[in-house]
Amino acid sequence: MSNDNKIFHLWTSKTNPLKNLSELLRDLLTEGNLECTSKGIRLISVSSNRSVLVHLKLHAENFEEYSCNESLTLGLNMEEYFKVVKLVESNETLRYYVTEEDKNTLAIQRYNKEEDIRNTKFIKLMDIPNDNINIPPISYESVIVMSSSRFQKICKEIYGFSDKLEITSIGNVLYFKSPNTEICIKPTDNNSGIKYESCDNKDEIIQGTFNLKYLVQFSKCANLSDNVKIHIKNDYPLLVECSVAKLGSVKICLAPQTEEG
């Protein structure tokens, strides 16, 4: 396919990660701007109720084909975007493009090589105000890596009883707590449990309570990556991140809840 009239174009066989990512974004955001440049795709957006910040980066070099001749903002309704991408099948590839003639439309094309079928959907782009969010660098006191499937299981289990989750790090021990549950995880010799990437003060108690709904939604990242990385610091937002297969990374940031909140 010629790219002569395309100002933005990517092609990839890594369809499952994009499919799972579209579901994750749909759950967390109503709409958002994909900022496309020659270096890749970035999204920084806050949920409609201002409760969670989502930060996504996909790197150009990780796609089989990628080109972006000028900086573009793709304003997407996340529900509509998910409805299109969820249709992709495991034996299909995905192509995204915007043409010079129609900069207000994103084309998403599925291709089945075996049957030589091209199925193209066209999404009208939205004019979404940018949040203009400046994310300052933060040095977190505890950074913990754990299995994404274990993280998902814990979040779902506790969500059956509570809408809040307390995360506490003491030394090299990590606790997940709710009013009727306490789950304690320690590092193991075979690295099958958790791993502390950093722990500034092993005697300090690092603790925060967070809205569990968004952590349950983000825990679907188990479909994207084997591990999640949890950054926690007293009186600071919680940062949870995972890789998007080998395409990039996605992070969420949650403010701690007060007893009244």
Q: Where are the model-predicted features located?
A:
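DNA polymerase sliding clamps and clamp-related checkpoint/processivity subunits
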Residues: 1-26, 31-160, 166-261
